[in-house]
Amino acid sequence: MKTVTEFQNKNILVLGIAKSGYAAATLLQKLGANVIVNDGKPLAENVLAAELQAKGMDVVCGGHPLELLERNISLVVKNPGIPYSNPILVAAKEKQIPIVTEVELAYRISEAPFVGITGSNGKTTTTMLTFEMLKEGQKHPVIAGNIGTVACEVAQDAKENEVVVTELSSFQLMGVELFQPKIAAFLNLFEAHLDYHGTKKEYGLAKANIFKNQTENDYSVINADDADVMALSAYSKGQKILFSTTKEIEDGACIKDNALYFKGEKVVEVSDIVLPGQHNLENILAAMSIAKLLGTSNEAITVVLKRFTGVKHRLEYVTTINNRKFYNDSKATNMLATEKALSAFTQPIVLLAGGLDRGNEFDDLIPYFKNVKAIVTFGQTAPKLVRAAEKAGLDIIESVDTLDEAVVKAYAHSKDGDVVLLSPACASWDQFKTFEERGDIFIQAVHKLI
């Protein structure tokens, strides 16, 4: 860890505890700051807050009183999920108090360079692929962020010869000031999180913060097939490395003659790749680009692609029952992810979909329903998905209250050779704590059919 003195004896407000807030508060105390921790949940229900209080921190729970800002606050470190419309953040901004997220702290203390990966979809798969390729190539990667350990915990132990690989959301990237990844990858962009950002434009600009501090000594890995990403890459001063699944890229990554190429050199045959789905070729090209920029051999990349079958809850194969294959794609929390999942199969599909209503309609899914023989909907968006399915002319459309019921109905509508696919196209928070919980419940329900 770098020697950092900028936080010594400063009053710093950590807003929202959870994993990242707990780690940030603990780190800041270690760096000599006077830490004030604030969380909306009452102290009696907040185990992490009680632990921080026991460490001698000033803990205020049960709301976000504006009076906290009267304590000569030098910096606010916010939980990524707390919107900037929260009154305490609005007031902090008016007082010109800097507001950052935990990844900014991680960068400031890390001896190791960062690889940052963002995009609307594919972040986790690309991050895991990158980590595995670098590990196989003996480039000493450590993984941080939404996967595994919180970034500022990882950064404390990261050495100069290592590289921190981290998945970055728009929520996290809104709170960066000095963060400068050696390699920044921007995978794709489409309309999402409008309840947080307001517009697609603001959402895209938040993502583009990944380029904010890059220089000509850094690299920006950019999806040449996504017009929005290409436009936002104008914010990067780094060396641009493009990747494409549709056209040849001489100075980047592409697919040619059934093989993946990087800067004109064949790296791996498509036939060696075991990860299913056309959309995953984009993720692989991005990860391969990062790995090659860091000196990973073609052999190491090939070894990984021959064994990497995917990430849990992302087109995860569950089991086969009476020649029906079941797949868990609970991470499909938006339409684009579900579109890509539906495009991954040629067999007839029984689709399970539904979840939190964020205000959007689902007509964009209609062109992807060509292999869908039946849909079972659940959650807040069930009526909207039913309308889209009716417009698509599906013969079998059913709505149920719970995911357990949906699994039973989906199996009843399936036949020999079909795929039964959970790909909700919605966030999980109407009925579940996380998309992981939703996926686990789906898997449990499937195994009950056996």
From Swiss-Prot:
Subcellular location, principal: cytoplasm
Chain coiled-coil ranges: none
Cell location: Cytoplasm
First and last residue of the signal peptide: none
Catalysed reactions, semicolon-separated: UDP-N-acetyl-alpha-D-muramoyl-L-alanine + D-glutamate + ATP = UDP-N-acetyl-alpha-D-muramoyl-L-alanyl-D-glutamate + ADP + phosphate + H(+)
Family: Belongs to the MurCDEF family.
Protein name listed in UniProt: UDP-N-acetylmuramoylalanine--D-glutamate ligase
Organism expressing this protein natively: Bacillus cereus (strain B4264)
UniProt gene name: murD
